């Protein structure tokens, strides 16, 4: 039986101990994807689409290359395993050994090179891929987020949500917001694409959540044009992109989306609390969106409206495998998180 590169994930109503008696929040659990995050959707779609094209052209199977030592690299590795493709992932020296092992366990060849992602990426594209091309193989470079085909894959999350709401007899006008974390804008762009396809982009506001130190979208919005961050300082390393995808920036302004920036302390506290409440370990990038479940006043403030008992808010729990519970405890101690 052929494996699929992503799974339909549950949309679960969760009641949070936030001082209010409500059942607003429906959480989409992308942590249950084969690669542990939403990235399985888009990156898997990119790889599958290009592999099908290569086979139809008679070029043989693809050789796939990724330069992410995080969730994108793991998504590429798991997608390639499902299609029996060779996958090479170049990671910088800063990559945690447990992530290297995870990517290797998914069947990818891992090369450690460079002091940061930029050096790993350059080595991958200019050295490794060039060598493979000389051998006559058709190669595919997998960017972590900035690719329209990747967004197309991520957009399936919206189709699923609409289907699942219908199954639960929940009408779309009850949905007052869709909340997602933003790094480089891949997930956000996919959500916008999905909302556009379903004629909902102007009806359901998207709340984009970032952490201070990785808040490239918020800083770009304040400047009025995309900026590049020279330094990334947040504990939410999976949100650590130096730039925001152009489509994400343009769509934010076009559809009147909302921006929230949280502190590392707030996000770490939420991750620990969520683990205690639900026995799910989510990394800070995911905890950023879940933070609004524990603090609905932030949501009401940014939406400039009261959210009532019959209203629904969709939270994308984007997943991620970059931190363990021990990592949270250590980081929380360093940042004096109570």
From Swiss-Prot:
Positions of modified residues (N6-(pyridoxal phosphate)lysine): 39
Taxonomic superkingdom: Eukaryota
Keyword presence, Cytoplasm: yes
Record InterPro entries: Ser/Thr_Dehydratase, Ser/Thr_deHydtase_PyrdxlP-BS, TrpB-like_PALP, TrpB-like_PALP_sf
Alphabetical list of CDD domains matching this protein: L-Ser-dehyd
GO MF annotation terms: L-serine ammonia-lyase activity; pyridoxal phosphate binding; threonine deaminase activity
PROSITE patterns: DEHYDRATASE_SER_THR
Catalytic activity: L-serine = pyruvate + NH4(+)
EC number: 4.3.1.17
Pathway in which the depicted protein is active: Carbohydrate biosynthesis; gluconeogenesis
Family that this chain belongs to: Belongs to the serine/threonine dehydratase family.
Protein name: L-serine dehydratase
């Amino acid at each position: 039986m052929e494996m699929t590169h992503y799974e339909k994930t549950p949309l679960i109503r969760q009641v949070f101990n936030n001082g209010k008696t409500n059942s607003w929040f429906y959480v989409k659990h992308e942590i249950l994807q084969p690669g542990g995050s939403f990235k399985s959707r888009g990156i898997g779609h990119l790889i599958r689409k290009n592999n099908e094209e290569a086979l139809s052209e008679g070029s043989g199977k693809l050789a796939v290359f990724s330069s992410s030592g995080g969730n994108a690299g793991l998504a590429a590795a798991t997608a390639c395993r499902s299609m029996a493709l060779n996958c090479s992932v170049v990671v910088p020296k800063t990559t945690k050994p447990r992530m290297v092992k995870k990517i290797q366990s998914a069947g990818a060849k891992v090369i450690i090179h460079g002091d940061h992602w930029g050096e790993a990426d350059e080595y991958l594209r200019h050295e490794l891929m060039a060598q493979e091309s000389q051998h006559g193989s058709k190669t595919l470079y997998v960017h972590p987020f900035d690719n329209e085909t990747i967004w197309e894959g991520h957009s399936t999350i919206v189709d699923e949500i609409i289907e699942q709401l219908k199954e639960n007899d929940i009408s779309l006008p009850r949905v007052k917001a869709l909340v997602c974390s933003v790094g480089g804008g891949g997930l956000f762009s996919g959500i916008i694409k999905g909302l556009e396809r379903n004629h909902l982009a102007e009806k359901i506001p998207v709340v984009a959540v970032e952490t201070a130190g990785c808040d490239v979208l918020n800083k770009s919005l304040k400047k009025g044009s995309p900026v590049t961050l020279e330094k990334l300082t947040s504990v939410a390393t999976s949100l650590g992109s130096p730039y925001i995808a152009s489509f994400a920036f343009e769509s934010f302004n076009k559809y009147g989306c909302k921006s929230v920036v949280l502190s590392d302390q707030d996000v770490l506290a939420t991750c620990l609390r969520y683990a205690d409440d639900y026995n799910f370990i989510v990394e800070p990038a995911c905890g950023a969106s879940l933070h609004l479940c524990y603090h609905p006043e932030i949501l009401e403030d940014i939406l400039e409206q009261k959210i009532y008992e019959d209203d629904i808010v969709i939270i994308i729990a984007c997943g991620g495998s970059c931190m363990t519970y021990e990592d949270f405890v250590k980081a929380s101690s360093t940042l004096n998180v109570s």
